[in-house]
Amino acid sequence: MVGMGDRLFNMVFTRRPPQSMSRCISDPGYRAAARFSYEEASAQYKVYVERLHSAGITVKELGPLEDYPDSVFIQDTAVIGGGSRVAVLARFGAPSRRGEEGHVVSILSSMGLEIHPVKPPGTLEGGDVLVTGEGVVFAGLSSRTNREGVETLKTAFPNVNVETLNAKGLHLLSHLGYLGKATLISAEGLYDKSIFKRHGFDLIEIPWEERDAANLLYLGEGRVLLPAGYNQTRDLLEQHGFRIVEAEIRQFMACMGGVTCLSLPIYNIL
């Protein structure tokens, strides 16, 4: 049963999509999902922001960065702790994205946060960091994040248990999500349930063909922001008592992005 008052964050940053997003990092399988349209991407971004506002979340919108085609995926730039007043500043594993993080430094500094930058040879992107409300943070090792980067995360947030596992996708959050109340979601057979069970987490498994739906955003109080078009996942979550809000983000999924990628939360628990 889903509880109340379990929201992980009350405020997020978002960044408007640049026209250069047509040159985003992707692969043919994802690129085929949608022909790029700046107008359509902008409209989908606007609806996404409206969904967050409707859930009572404060959204601070930042302007587009034309020099960085993937910059709309602002989640990757940092991991921000609202309780500790600490932020880990990313060092991108994707060389073409290095420099994006510099555009959030002044914002983090203006908030009075203690900034822990990931230093070479470390790499860490926010999409590999799954924060939960149970004092456990799952950090994914991927082509974008390495062990040195995760060590920076552990040092910055000693108040939580940072557990490392191999990401089964571009990022850990590509196919693994958090649903509140010690519950995770992923595609069937993708992760060994025992990895999470030993930390007290249940795992809801969705059909393999809808694995991208696991990149969802838990809004608290049983509400889930889900990418549109994943009907089996929506029905399954509703059976578990969740209230589903959908957002069409096909333009961003064509760039291998998802619901979590489009916002940078200030986590209450960190």
UniProtKB/Swiss-Prot annotation:
The active site is at 171 (proton donor), 261 (nucleophile). This is Uncharacterized protein APE_2601.1. GO terms for molecular function: amino acid binding; dimethylargininase activity. The keyword Hydrolase applies. Keywords: Hydrolase. Its EC number is 3.5.3.-. It is an enzyme of class 3 (hydrolase). GO terms for biological process: arginine metabolic process; citrulline metabolic process; positive regulation of nitric oxide biosynthetic process. Belongs to the DDAH family.
